């Protein structure tokens, strides 16, 4: 992994920090299971997922059912100047939301492409901003929100598309 980076020492430090955090989390989880039992810890984890899902659904239910559209564009990809549309359609039905980026530009040669994970993360973050209370971030809060990113697009490019700026500008 680090061989594919211009700053391998930095990436190695990042990876080591992530691994250390995972090891601490593993120890704490095992300690909770030791103290409270696997069934009880699992039940509480499921309850937390359900709580986050319900809180996110409540946020979505405050939005009137319907379809909402928005379009913007970038004026170039760093390789040249041309119109690069980003289109989104937001469909709300009760406690469910679909955010569809179909119709957005195809992937480009420059580094403004954004990988699907960035687009989903930015979308879910926007939904969370609508919440009046803190929503615990876990898989439960993602369930009511479907994010569609068309393949081969600016927002879901094929490997090895350039994506460096997509993390901050496009996503």
Residue map of PLM features:
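Stable alpha-helical structural segments in soluble proteins, enriched in small hydrophobic residues
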Residues: 18-21, 25-28, 55, 59, ...
């Amino acid at each position: 992994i680090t061989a594919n980076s211009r700053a391998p020492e930095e990436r190695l430090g990042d990876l080591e920090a992530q691994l250390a955090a995972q090891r601490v989390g593993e120890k704490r989880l095992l300690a909770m299971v030791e103290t409270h039992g696997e069934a009880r810890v699992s039940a509480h984890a499921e309850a937390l997922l359900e709580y986050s899902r319900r809180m996110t659904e409540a946020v979505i239910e405050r939005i009137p059912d319907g379809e909402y559209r928005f379009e913007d564009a970038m004026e170039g990809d760093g390789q040249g100047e041309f119109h690069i549309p980003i289109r989104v359609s937001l469909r709300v039905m009760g406690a469910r939301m679909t955010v569809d980026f179909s119709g957005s530009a195809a992937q480009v040669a420059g580094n403004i492409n954004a990988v699907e994970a960035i687009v989903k993360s930015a979308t879910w973050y926007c939904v969370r901003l609508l919440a009046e209370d803190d929503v615990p971030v876990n898989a439960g809060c993602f369930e009511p929100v479907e994010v569609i990113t068309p393949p081969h697009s600016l927002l879901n490019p094929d490997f090895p598309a350039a994506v460096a700026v997509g993390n901050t500008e496009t996503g």
